[in-house]
Structure formats: C-alpha cells, structure tokens
C-alpha cells in the first residue's frame, strides 16, 4: 500500500468515526432515534415455514388483519414475510426490562457437541459463522428439542410441542415457531431470539462492553415512527441509494417507507460465505435503522454500526477494516445474550421420552455424581423419567435404562444424549456391568492387563472393557493372515491351489507357525499387514520387529475382523465359507478359552494365541464366533503381563463361560 493511499484510508476512517461520534452526541440514548441514513425493511420479518404451517396459519392470520406475503426462494426454504397488524410487533408496547443473570459464565465453560438432530442444518448454513459454538446441549422445551448457540438457537419441533400462546418464563413461547426460519429439508426451526431479548428488554450492552445500545434501545428503535421515507418514481423492494440499500416496507404515491442497510452492513450480510441462502433467508428483513455506538473491544474503544434484523443482529466495526476495505462485520451473540439474561433455561421433560447416548457415559446416582449404576455407550437407549437439573452450566437428566437381564435408573449428562434415534442397523454399546456386574468387577480386578469385547449379534449389542488397548496378538493374528491372503488371491481372480490350501489349513487348524511365516512373507511382512488393516478399516495395529506373533492389536480390532468375516463384508461368499470352515475345525488341543467353555450344543469358529511377550511374561488370548441355537455372539478376551500361564488361561475361561451362560440362558 502506498503512503498516499494509507493517508486517504486513515482520513476516511477518521471521518467515519467522527460521524459516529456526532451521531452519538446528537442522540443521547444512542439510538432511541436512529440516524436518518442507514438501512433496510423492518416489519417484513423473514419466517421460514413449511407448506403445512403456512396453511395452518394463513386463515387465522387473515382473520386477524395480518398481511402475509410469500416470496419464492431456492432450496428447501419457504419464506413468509409478515407485517403485524397496525405495524406493531409483539414487543411494541412492552416496557419490561431484565438485568443480566450472574450465572452465564458457567455456560461458557462447557464443551457441548452439536446435537445430531441439528448437524446437517448447521453444516449447510455455515453454522460456525452464523450460529457459533454450542453453549448448551440439546434440551426439551415446550417448543421441542432446543439447542442454544453463541449467536442463536435451533429447535426440532416434536409432536408434543406445546401450542400454548402463554409466554413461557424463558421467553420460548410457541409463536417463535411461526416467526422463526423453517427448513423443510431438515424440519429445523432457527428461532428469532432477538424477539425474546426485545420482549424481555435485556439491558445487556449490544456490541461490546460500555456500548450505549442495549436491547431496550433496539426495542425502541423498531417503533414504526422510525421508518425512513424515500421518494421513488417507481417504488421497488430494494433500491440502491448514496447511503446503501433502501428496502421498502410499503409504498404510496411515490413515497416508500422502509429502512436503509448501510453499504458496510450490506457487504457483510450479502457475503455468500456468511449467508449461503441469501441475506433475507439468513438474517430476515431489518427491524431498525443502523444505530451508532461505541464499545470496548479488546481493551480499546471502537465505533460500531449496529442493525437489528428479524433473525440476527449485525455489527460492523468502523475502526477495523477487512481485506475488502470494508469494516469487519459480525453476527452478535444472541444466544449468549439470551443465556446471560435468563441464566439456565427452563427444561420441559415429558416422562417416558426416548433418547439415546452419543458416546460412553456413566449413569450416576446424582447429577454430577461419581457413583455409577452402569456404564453405557453409543446408541444405548434411555427413557427420561421427568426430572432434569442444571449443575454448573451442565444439564442432567434423570433416566431409566434396561439391558438384557438388568435395569436401573440414574442421571445422564444431557451433553451425551440425543433425540435422534440411531441409524438402522447401528449397534448399541455398553460396559460389562450392563450385562453382569460380577463379570465387570472381575475384569476390572486385572486393570489394564485384560481387555475384552463381546458382540451379541442376536440383539445387536456390544459389551466392552479396555477394548481399545493394544495387546500382543500371538497366534490370533493368523485369522488376519488368512483373510488378507484370501483377499490377495481374490485380487488375482482365483482361490487357493492345493499347496496354498495345505498352508492355510496348517496355519489355522494346527496353528503351524512355519505356515504362518510363509503367508506373512508372501504378503509383504509387517507392511503388508498394516496395509490390510487399513484397507478393511481396522485401526490400532502396531508392527513389531520380532514378527507377526509379537505385533499388537486392540480387542476391538480383532472383533472387527471377525465381524467382517462373519457378516460377509470382507470376502466372497465362497471364501468366507472356506475361512469359517477352517476355524470350525481347530485341533482339540487348540480348544482353549472360548473353545472349552461353550454353552451346551454350541459350535465355534475360533483362534487362540499364547506367547511369552518381549517382557518375558505371558500374552494369552482367545477369540471366536459362537453359535448356540438361535443365539450368536462373537467374543474376544486378551491378556498381557501374566506371570502364570495357567492363571492367564483361567481368565479367558472365566469370562467366556460367564458370557456364554448370560447370552444363551433365559
């Protein structure tokens, strides 16, 4: 940049700042009377509703003297612009003011995920910019499942959503569903939290500390008397003027009434990255003229233009230009200001509401407690029992849970709960204490030296302990060597010849190490096995310089290999049957662990392994696919650092026998 251009820009910025200061001086309340120049239409509030909602609302709306105007828009959005009767908004005659709650800071300390119900919408509308971080988990209100973000709030309405018109204590009454933005593709409604803050009369400074603009100021600035007027030969919806873009609200005899969006704000709201669905669909029409204020930002005083739109409030910083030479803009944190005004939101929990866990969680005795009644995991179902509690910014639900043979109750963290049911066929996860507290205690007594996973294929349910901890594979690695070799043969368009059949048979049925070494070498050694696991989507394999027997894999990895094999997702039907037949004919002296503790009448496709590990202690494991009548399950039990050979086998026997009895007996 040349020095002349730098001087010109500095002069322009100074002039802009002077104009703002003069406006502040001329308007003591900073905006009860907005500046005459800037902004857009105001009474036409963008409301996205489905066709069904439009039909449901149109008749009573017309009966009440309300004008509805429908605008064609792209994608899944249907926009309805509403002009309230008499030009008044619901908050027009409200005088209430609400001081900030001291409890907001606790929400800022939380790390809430975006609920699966809102993820698709959040991604599509560039939620990282438009909505910001999640400040709460998804929680139930009279509107449905609600999640508050830094800059707004989303709702997934439910069939039980209240249609009551009574103002809720948290401001979330049913009218917001009709004045928000409805996305027909996802069924999500983006709530107009500005409505709530204007109705409450929040006294939080808008734009930054020390700002003279509050939501009380914005409320006053939405009064119809602040509509700007423009002489137009032929009034149109938007008109470019010297001050920006004038958006007409109404027109009569060549005079249009509306608001002007200053160029700096117009540049921001029409940025396709900020508003991928267009400015009206993203922000709604403006409710006010642009208001001037000063605020403390990062310890320095900045001059701002603030403009309220139906769905968001926008501020541009006149003292901070972006790369485009325009003042930097931002969506003001309506969600944060909502929580800062009211504190913990009101939660409405209908008894018996079904939810699912999104990750591993301890179901505890009290909110935030440390005594767990059970450990459940992803996709585990819970039933809400009607109670909830906010604790240090985190929400907890009282829940009931049920497993194969057990049931109980306790408190679950709402941040790990979703209303979205798992995808079809998705399995549920739980700790062993959901199957048997005794087995769970037994496993826990060995700490990190034992890992186990059980997949109850009949009920699509996993139970696990230390499932992601790597253990030395020993001869259980021969299952992966067999599968990867058959895949290699399939890539050549053939099956094993007589010699290869003999090698594979010796490796699996007789656990011949020389046969395993031959297969291992043909596949490229450790790098070949690493490539195999990557190809089938199994993680956690660790190569070892001593060879295939001392390589490591978590119990979950072995479970995934066996599951892919059993479900026919890794080999052709012919090769799958071939592999399982070998595993079903293990020599009698190889039937340890799962093989010697089978339920009566059961069969197993299995592979055990044992080896003195590099530390000189025993690594012993067992794994297999068990079929017992109509029941089928896969079990993996790995041990490490065992000084007693027989004692290590007893661990595998104890777990396999207990699991078999639990899964196959009524």
Regions found by a protein language model. Give the residues of each.
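Short, well-structured active-site flanking segments
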Residues: 487-505, 525-527, 573-576
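Penicillin-recognizing serine hydrolase domain
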Residues: 425-459, 463, 518-666
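Active-site SXXK
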Residues: 460, 470-494, 507, 635
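Boundary regions of SH3-family modules and the immediately adjacent low-complexity/disordered segments
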Residues: 346-350, 397-427
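Hydrophobic single-pass membrane-insertion segments
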Residues: 63-76
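Extended, compositionally biased repeat/scaffold regions that form elongated interaction surfaces
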Residues: 74-362, 376, 380, 386-390, ...
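N-terminal Sec-pathway targeting helices
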Residues: 40-55
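N-terminal intrinsically disordered, acidic low-complexity segments at the extreme N-terminus
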Residues: 1-37
């Amino acid at each position: 940049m040349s020095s002349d251009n730098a001087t010109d820009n500095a002069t322009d910025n100074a002039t802009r700042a002077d104009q703002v200061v003069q406006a502040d001086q001329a308007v003591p309340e900073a905006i009860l009377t907005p500046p005459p120049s800037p902004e857009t239409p105001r009474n036409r509030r963008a409301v996205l509703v489905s066709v069904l909602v439009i039909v449901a609302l149109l008749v009573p709306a017309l009966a009440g003297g309300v004008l509805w105007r429908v605008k064609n828009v792209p994608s899944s959005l249907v926009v309805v612009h509403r002009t309230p009767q008499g030009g008044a908004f619901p908050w027009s005659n409200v005088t209430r003011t609400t001081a900030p709650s001291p409890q907001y800071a606790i929400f800022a300390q939380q790390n809430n995920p975006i609920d699966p119900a809102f993820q698709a919408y959040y991604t599509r509308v560039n939620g990282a910019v438009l909505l910001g971080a999640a400040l709460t988990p998804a929680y139930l209100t009279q509107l449905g499942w609600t999640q508050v973000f830094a800059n707004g709030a989303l709702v997934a309405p439910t069939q039980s959503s209240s249609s009551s018109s009574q103002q809720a204590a948290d401001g979330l009454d049913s009218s917001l569903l009709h004045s928000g933005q409805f996305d027909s593709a996802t069924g999500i409604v983006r709530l107009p939290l500005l409505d709530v803050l204007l109705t409450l009369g929040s006294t939080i400074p808008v734009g930054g500390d020390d700002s003279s603009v509050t939501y009380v100021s914005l409320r006053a600035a939405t009064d119809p008397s602040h509509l700007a007027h423009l002489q137009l030969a032929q009034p149109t919806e938007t008109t470019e003027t010297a001050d920006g873009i004038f958006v007409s609200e109404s027109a009569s005899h060549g005079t249009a009434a509306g608001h002007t969006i200053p160029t700096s704000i117009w540049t921001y709201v029409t940025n396709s990255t900020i508003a991928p669905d267009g400015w009206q669909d993203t922000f709604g029409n403006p409710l006010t003229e642009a208001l001037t204020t000063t605020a403390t930002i990062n310890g320095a005083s900045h001059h701002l233009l603030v403009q309220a739109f139906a769905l968001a409030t926008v501020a541009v910083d006149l003292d901070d230009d972006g790369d485009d030479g325009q003042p930097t803009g931002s969506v003001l944190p309506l969600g944060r200001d909502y929580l800062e005004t009211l504190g913990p939101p009101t939660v409405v929990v209908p008894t018996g509401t079904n939810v699912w866990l999104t990750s591993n969680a301890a179901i505890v005795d009290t909110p935030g407690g440390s005594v767990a009644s059970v450990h459940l995991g992803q996709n585990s179902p819970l039933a809400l029992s009607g109670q909830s509690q906010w604790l240090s910014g985190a929400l907890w639900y009282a829940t009931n849970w049920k497993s194969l043979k057990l049931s109980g109750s306790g408190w679950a963290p709402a941040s790990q709960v979703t209303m979205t049911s798992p995808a079809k066929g998705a399995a549920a996860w739980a700790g062993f204490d959901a199957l048997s507290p005794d087995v769970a205690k037994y496993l826990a007594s060995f700490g990190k030296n034992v890992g186990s996973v059980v997949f109850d294929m009949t009920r699509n349910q996993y139970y696990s302990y230390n499932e992601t901890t790597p253990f030395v594979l020993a001869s259980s690695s021969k299952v992966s060597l067999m599968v990867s070799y058959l895949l290699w043969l399939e890539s050549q368009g053939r099956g094993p010849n007589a010699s290869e059949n003999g090698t594979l048979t010796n490796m699996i049925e007789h656990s011949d190490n020389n046969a395993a070494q031959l297969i291992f070498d043909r596949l490229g050694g450790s790098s070949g096995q690493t490539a195999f696991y990557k190809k089938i989507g199994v993680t956690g394999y660790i190569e070892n310089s001593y060879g295939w027997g001392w390589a490591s894999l978590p119990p979950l990895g072995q479970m995934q290999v066996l599951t892919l094999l059993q479900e026919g997702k890794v080999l052709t039907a012919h090769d799958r049957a071939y592999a399982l037949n070998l595993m079903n004919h293990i020599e009698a002296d190889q039937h340890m662990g799962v093989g010697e503790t089978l339920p009566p009448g059961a069969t197993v496709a299995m592979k055990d392994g044992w080896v003195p590990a590099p530390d000189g202690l025993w690594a012993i494991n067992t794994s297999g696919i068990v079929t017992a009548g109509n029941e089928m399950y896969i079990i993996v039990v790995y041990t490490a650092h065992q000084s007693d050979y027989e004692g290590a086998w007893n661990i595998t026997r104890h777990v396999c026998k207990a699991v078999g009895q639990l899964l196959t007996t009524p």
